[in-house]
Curated annotation (Swiss-Prot):
EC identifiers of the protein: 2.7.1.48
Reported phenotype of the disruption mutant: No visible phenotype. No decrease in uracil phosphoribosyltransferase activity. Loss of sensitivity to 5'-fluorouracil and 5'-fluorouridine.
UniProt gene name: UKL2
Function as written in the Swiss-Prot or TrEMBL entry: Involved in the pyrimidine salvage pathway. Phosphorylates uridine to uridine monophosphate (UMP). Phosphorylates cytidine to cytidine monophosphate (CMP). Does not possess uracil phosphoribosyltransferase (UPRTase) activity that catalyzes the conversion of uracil and 5-phospho-alpha-D-ribose 1-diphosphate (PRPP) to UMP and diphosphate.
Organism of origin: Arabidopsis thaliana
Location within or outside the cell: Plastid, Chloroplast
Identification of the protein by name: Uridine/cytidine kinase UKL1, chloroplastic
Region (Uridine kinase): 59-264
Gene Ontology cellular-component annotations: chloroplast
Lineage: Eukaryota, Viridiplantae, Streptophyta, Embryophyta, Tracheophyta
Similarity comment text for this entry: In the N-terminal section; belongs to the uridine kinase family.
Length: 483
């Protein structure tokens, strides 16, 4: 790069192929190249390819959806509708019925008395193993259950491969907490009991070789009690309840829109709904490229860091509560808008966090800003040295400022202090430029109600607890004390 040009325009001009600052980096964009610059094992930035992920070669965690409801409620129809609308993604449907246990000879003799709607009828351990294997990106051979012989087929199975979305469907997929914990979205299909019974009679007589009397007897003896004892109570775990099942096209459309949004997010955003990564554009990735370069001048480092910080602050402010407000425009017309949150303050973690104060002041005129100093004693030890916070901080929403989220230990101590001062956990928004996955896990598991807003999630921490690929000691580089 020429010495007299470190502007982001230079980065844009030198990268081959078309670029648009508003374009999302949801996939690989390929174009001819003459040379490339890469960072081994982390992410690739070259003229030939550009990826929105931290590591294009790394497997991504699939999005797991659980779909349950009463027997014949329309679960399969809902799953089919979701699959059809997500046709551009790799989807695997795992039916809980495939994991019925094969009946013993004694159970077969009294098959009419066997309760197929009880949790013990399923091999939950194998279902868990199946999902774990699929989430790791490996193929799995799903057993095929024969409802006429009540045994698994020995010489047949269904091979499923790595995928983007896993749909777990079955009447009791919400019953076991271990299975629930694997799900990113839980859907309960709610259909009238009479409709479900009519569907059950038709299905079991046509597809499973049963007669009507045996279906009705089984329904009254096992199915209805199992629904009341196991299925209906699991409704409380659902994130989404769909009335009328597959007939509710509006509900399914909204679910698919949400899934599309989640599939475009970082894996950690799927796990923690309180983690928000600002939308990635070539401008943002270009600025990250500049501030991460070790030989950039201090002036340019500060300039592009300030630009990124401003974007993070603006995004963080968007998560504050707003009230509706109407104003009269110069034309005499009424404009319906919103009013900003009044009770707000910033808290910077000294000293790197102080680099974010100017952007916050530029966005919020006259905002109060407190300070917290935490001393690092060794790798994990933390000691609070100094704090000066607004006296009425318990009545305010707090923007916690720290440009780098590494281990999460100092962040946890700062958040704990704010909570001790009376700040509700849900009123804290933690703003940073880059975050390590370890730090996000550490903070979100302990404080699930606060929000984290960042511009990029990096790959990992190294043995020295530095963020990789990272950008070095941010405070030293920003304030010019790294020499």
């Amino acid at each position: 790069m020429p010495e007299d040009s470190t502007a982001i325009d230079y980065v844009m001009e030198k990268a081959s192929g078309p670029h648009f600052s508003g374009l999302r980096l949801d996939g690989l964009l390929s174009s001819p190249s003459k040379s490339s610059v890469s960072s081994p094992s982390h992410f690739r930035l070259s003229n030939s390819s550009f990826s929105a992920t931290d590591d294009p070669a790394a497997p991504h965690q699939p999005f797991v959806i659980g779909v349950t409801g009463g027997t014949a409620s329309g679960k399969t129809t809902v799953c089919d509708m979701i699959i059809q609308q997500l046709h551009d993604h790799r989807i695997v449907l795992v039916n809980q019925d495939s994991f019925y246990r094969g009946l013993t000879s004694e159970e077969l003799e009294h098959v009419q008395e066997y309760n197929f709607d009880h949790p013990d009828a399923f091999d939950t351990e194998q279902l868990l193993h199946c999902v774990d294997i699929l989430k790791s990106g490996q193929p799995y051979q799903i057993p095929i259950y024969d409802f006429k012989t009540h045994q698994r087929k020995v010489d047949a199975f269904r091979q499923v491969n790595a995928c983007d979305v896993i749909i777990l469907e079955g009447i009791l997929v919400f019953h076991d907490s271990r299975v629930r914990d694997l799900m990113n979205m839980k859907i309960f299909v709610d259909t009238d009991a009479d409709v479900r019974l009519a569907r059950r009679i038709r299905r079991d007589t046509v597809e499973r070789g049963r007669d009507v009397d045996s279906v009705l007897e089984q329904y009254a003896k096992f199915v209805k009690p199992a629904f009341d004892d196991f299925v209906l109570p699991s409704k409380k775990y659902a994130d989404v309840i769909i009335p009328r099942g597959g007939d509710n096209h509006v509900a399914v459309d909204l679910i698919v829109q949400h899934i599309h949004t989640k599939l475009g997010q970082h894996d950690l955003c799927k796990i923690y709904p309180n983690v928000f990564v600002i939308e990635t554009t070539f401008q943002i990735r270009g600025m990250h490229t500049l501030i991460r370069e070790k030989d950039i001048s201090k002036h340019d480092f500060v300039f592009y860091s300030d630009r990124l910080i401003r974007l993070v602050v603006e995004h963080g402010l968007g998560h504050l509560p707003f009230t509706e407000k109407q104003v009269v425009t110069p034309t005499g017309s009424v404009y319906s808008g919103v009013d900003f949150c009044k009770k707000l303050c910033g808290v910077s973690v000294i000293r790197s966090g102080e680099s974010m104060e100017n952007a916050l002041r530029a966005c919020c005129k006259g905002i109060k800003i407190g300070k917290i100093l935490i001393h690092r004693d060794g790798d994990n030890g933390m000691q609070l040295i100094y704090e000066k916070l607004p006296s009425d901080i318990s009545e305010r929403h707090v923007l916690l400022l720290d440009p780098v989220l590494g281990t999460g230990n100092s962040a946890n101590q700062a958040i704990e202090l704010l909570i001790q001062k009376g700040v509700p956990e849900a009123h804290i928004i933690f703003l940073n430029l880059i975050s390590a996955p370890e730090g996000i896990h550490c903070v979100c598991k302990r404080f699930p109600k606060l929000k984290i807003v960042t511009s990029e999630i990096d790959q990992c921490l190294n043995e020295e607890f530095r963020v990789i690929p990272g950008l070095g000691e941010f405070g030293d580089r920003y304030f010019g004390t790294d020499e």
